[in-house]
């Protein structure tokens, strides 16, 4: 089985999931007009995301010869984002603080991972549970973020910048706890880079992400003000 990035299996996965995602979002946009209908769509997606991230974490718990329940807690930015985003969609209110922290991180992280799933060859087939659940929770997270934006559930504004600061701090706190208490060699790339041979640890990625996110917020704010000016 060709498990290379952009190999046969990866291309087949993209050829199936991307069109289905687009079609699903288009249909949701067309038919989910009421707030109740939008809520049903979003909570269904949130439930699906929660299922896949829990399956992924359980596959890590039982992956080796001994049961390791400490693995139930995600130790990556994407994994934790999938978990907290799913919970926020299921139990949070519109435009909640978690959305403001996770929408951009989820959008960027899920897109990069779906297009470059470096874990694809970790098992004998793509159906190896840690692999397929990893692919699917990233794919569903991407759909969830797009659906939240599409349905106007997030009012993106620079005034909520602090959500990203506190969210990122919380992630690193969890990571430090996992390393100190459970003996993880690394968590949230505190100690090791996301790409081997690069300096891209969390401490390097954080300012890069902050600058990129700040530029996105600035662009959105300028576009919003221009539209308001044109209306007046």
Regions found by a protein language model. Name each.
Residues 1-42, 47, 53-55:
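N-terminal topogenic module of multi-pass integral membrane proteins
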Residues 2-16, 159-170, 180-218:
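Membrane-interface transmembrane-helix boundary segments in multi-pass integral membrane proteins
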Residues 13-25, 78-90, 137-151, 204-220:
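Hydrophobic cores of alpha-helical transmembrane segments in multi-pass inner/ER membrane proteins
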Residues 29-42, 90-99, 150-162, 226:
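Membrane-interface helix-boundary motifs at transmembrane edges
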Residues 40-44, 72-73, 99-106:
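Cytoplasmic-side transmembrane-helix entry/capping segments in multi-pass membrane proteins
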Residues 55-65, 115-125, 181:
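Juxtamembrane "helix-exit" motif on the non-cytosolic side of transmembrane helices
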Residues 64-98:
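Hydrophobic/aromatic-rich structural module bridging two neighboring secondary-structure elements via a short loop
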Residues 87-151:
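Membrane-proximal helix-loop-helix units in multi-pass membrane proteins
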């Amino acid at each position: 089985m060709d498990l290379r990035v952009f190999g046969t299996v990866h291309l087949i996965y993209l050829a199936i999931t991307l069109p289905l995602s687009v079609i699903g979002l288009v249909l949701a946009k067309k038919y989910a007009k009421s707030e109740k209908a939008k809520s049903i769509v979003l909570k269904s997606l949130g439930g699906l995301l929660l299922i896949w991230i829990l399956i992924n974490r359980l596959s890590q718990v039982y992956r080796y010869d001994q049961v390791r329940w400490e693995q139930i807690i995600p130790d990556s930015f994407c994994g934790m984002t999938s978990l907290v985003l799913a919970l926020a969609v299921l139990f949070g209110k519109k435009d909640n603080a978690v959305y403001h922290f996770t929408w951009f991180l989820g959008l960027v992280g899920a897109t990069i991972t779906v297009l470059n799933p470096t874990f694809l060859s970790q098992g004998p087939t793509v159906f190896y549970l840690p692999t397929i659940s990893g692919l699917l929770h990233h794919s569903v997270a991407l759909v969830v973020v797009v659906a939240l934006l599409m349905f106007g559930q997030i009012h993106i504004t620079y005034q909520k910048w602090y959500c990203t600061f506190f969210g990122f701090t919380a992630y690193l706190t969890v990571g430090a706890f996992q390393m100190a208490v459970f003996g993880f060699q690394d968590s949230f790339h505190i100690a090791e880079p996301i790409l081997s041979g690069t300096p891209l640890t969390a401490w390097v990625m954080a300012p890069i992400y902050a600058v990129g996110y700040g530029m996105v917020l600035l662009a959105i704010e300028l576009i919003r003000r221009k539209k308001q000016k044109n209306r007046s």
